[in-house]
């Protein structure tokens, strides 16, 4: 079975958040389908549809826990900013003082695009760290797939268009506020 993972992983294109390649989830699934067992292929398809429960893959469990940690830590930051109690989040097993300072620095950025990019980079780095010890196994393929989803999400961002849309929304809100006053 190792040979099939070696072949499929070595045949996948290199991706990072800065590359602009035309590679899709369909391309990925077409590339891996012939090399994987039906069970493994169906697992990836379920992952595509977010139908994966915890306990089926250690990598998925770690990544979902990481996302929960980021979510709870961000919620604590936002509660603090709004002057609300953050005790609920601080007492959670998902709260992380390690990520607190990282997320504070990310949230200090004024550009929403840069904030989203920083969150994606944080997720990318976490997945890269998970790759250690997974050279040519199914877990490495899952990590690649999760990175591919981040890559595709990132390629949807159009910074100039996003800034223009953001400015238009802010202008409309200001105009509506001024009308009421």
Curated annotation (Swiss-Prot):
Q: What is the lineage of its organism?
A: Bacteria, Pseudomonadati, Spirochaetota, Spirochaetia, Spirochaetales
What name appears for this protein in its UniProt entry?
A: Uncharacterized protein BB_0095
Species this chain originates from: Borreliella burgdorferi (strain ATCC 35210 / DSM 4680 / CIP 102532 / B31)
């Amino acid at each position: 079975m190792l040979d099939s993972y070696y072949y499929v992983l070595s045949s996948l294109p290199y991706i990072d958040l800065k590359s602009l390649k035309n590679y899709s989830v369909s391309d990925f699934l077409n590339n891996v389908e012939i090399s994987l067992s039906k069970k493994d292929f169906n697992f990836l398809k379920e992952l595509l549809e977010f139908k994966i429960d915890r306990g089926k893959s250690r990598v998925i469990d770690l990544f979902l826990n990481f996302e929960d940690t980021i979510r709870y830590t961000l919620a604590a930051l936002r509660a603090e900013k709004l002057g609300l109690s953050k005790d609920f989040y601080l007492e959670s097993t998902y709260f992380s003082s390690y990520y607190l300072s990282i997320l504070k620095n990310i949230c200090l950025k004024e550009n929403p695009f840069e904030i989203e990019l920083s969150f994606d980079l944080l997720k990318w780095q976490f997945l890269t760290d998970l790759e250690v010890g997974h050279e040519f196994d199914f877990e490495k393929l899952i990590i690649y797939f999760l990175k591919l989803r981040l890559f595709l999400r990132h390629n949807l961002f159009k910074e100039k268009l996003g800034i223009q849309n953001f400015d238009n929304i802010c202008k409309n809100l200001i105009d509506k506020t001024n009308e009421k006053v």
